Amino acid sequence: MQILFVASEVAPWSKTGGLGDVAGALPRALAERGNEVVVVTPRHGSIDPRAAGLQPVRTSLHVRGEPVALWVKRGPAPVYFVEHPHLFGSRRGLYGDGGRDHPDNAERFAFLTRAALALPGALGLRPRILHLNDWQCGLGPWLLRHEHARDPALAGARTVFTIHNLAYQGLFPKQVLPALGLPWEVFRWEAMEFFDQLSFMKAGLAFADALTTVSPTYAREILTPEGGASLDALLRHRARDLHGILNGIDVHAWDPARDPHLPAHFTPGELAGKAACKAALQREVGLPVRRDAPLAGLVTRLAEQKGIDLVAAALPALLARDVQVVLLGSGDPAYEEAFARAAREHPDRVAARIGFDEGLAHRIEAGADLFLMPSRFEPCGLNQMYSLRYGTVPVVRSVGGLADTVEDFDGFARGTGFRFAEYTPQALLTATRRALDVFRDRRAWRGLVERGMAEDNSWERSAARYEALYRTLAP
């Protein structure tokens, strides 16, 4: 099956979050199953074509009469990079700079989507599925119906629109419609109008043939007023077309048996390397090397969506239980300063690294005993799956993909982590204390670790579910 996969970011070339990871891994997994997958994404200003090994493409691609240059990264699922010197090439930030969105994001991502839809005709492709991701590609289903209805390259193509995070909706003033080349008739409540603004997210939800999101629990949550970000009525109307398909992880990049970022390697049957990773991590971040001290890790955005307010409130009680904490992340300046201050005040208990370091993220996953993810909401989440694979026991809130991937320990021989429901510091503390009690029981703890490491969270499983959905749309 030929699939056109469109995303505003694709790891490792561009990434701000889970969307980039999905767009970098799912197309490859689909290609490994025998599908012909082509990925389309912008050539952001942060991407150096020469350093990335991109090749220029000779093509007659045009968007609204304007010629468009293309680059390609060859591979099992080739990635085509759409060039536009002003809209993309001159920008370092993918969506904004200095904490502010680019003011022309509507024009930028309408251009990307139009370029993606024009690409099959320019390259001689005949995709049966157009897989469009998040608000940035939300205009795609409408554009397919109204601007490509007679395009032979897209004849019979069906659309899948994936919601990675419903909270980000691509909202713009209605006055941008003429600049986008859209008729005023789309600005209706049953189309793209959303509280007197134009919503790219709503466009995708209203016009795509099938909707997916990144975990079964999140698919249920967004049907409710509490989780639906004011789009729950539309989503309930389309509930039969909505599918929750759990994300996977790259089990080659995240493999404790051969991860190049680690000082030692380990497997479920031989865990000595994990103890070595813990000691090395403690030395690296300046904590006392203590095998007996539970080491809790966090790799996170410092934002309330991630529950960082709960961690900050619970931190004094955690430290009173002789817990060491290592945090890697950036975000809200107030939380950056709060954790930097905690590290200064408790240098033997807290280590805070503000920013991001890919290697250190791997070493935290390998060296920590516990991993804290108390998210307010979490469409899928990846770090809890990395933790399971690395024998690090997750403590998570029972929302979204966290509820789908972490089974609560039953006190005997079932479970892979510890879950809690209420969004309060006390609930986080209670779950963490349960984990600490089991940590003292080496036999029970090893069982938790081994069960987590045995979980299959590969992209192969997720790709099979997407492929099955595609075939129901385009038999």
Curated annotation (Swiss-Prot):
**A cellular component term, taken from the record's GO annotations:** cytosol
Q: Could you tell me which pathway this protein works in?
A: Glycan biosynthesis; glycogen biosynthesis
Which GO MF terms does the UniProt record name?
Answer: alpha-1,4-glucan glucosyltransferase (ADP-glucose donor) activity; alpha-1,4-glucan glucosyltransferase (UDP-glucose donor) activity
Top-level taxonomic group: Bacteria
In this UniProt entry, which cysteines form S-S bonds?
A: none
Q: What Gene Ontology terms for biological process does this UniProt record contain?
A: glycogen biosynthetic process
Q: Which reaction does it catalyse?
A: [(1->4)-alpha-D-glucosyl](n) + ADP-alpha-D-glucose = [(1->4)-alpha-D-glucosyl](n+1) + ADP + H(+)
One Pfam short name = Glycos_transf_1
UniProt keyword terms in alphabetical order: Glycogen biosynthesis, Glycosyltransferase, Transferase
Describe the task this protein carries out.
Synthesizes alpha-1,4-glucan chains using ADP-glucose.
User: Which PANTHER family does this entry report, sorted A to Z?
Assistant: ALPHA AMYLASE DOMAIN-CONTAINING PROTEIN (PTHR45825:SF11), GRANULE-BOUND STARCH SYNTHASE 1, CHLOROPLASTIC/AMYLOPLASTIC (PTHR45825)
Return the protein name: Glycogen synthase
- Lineage start: Bacteria, Pseudomonadati, Myxococcota, Myxococcia, Myxococcales
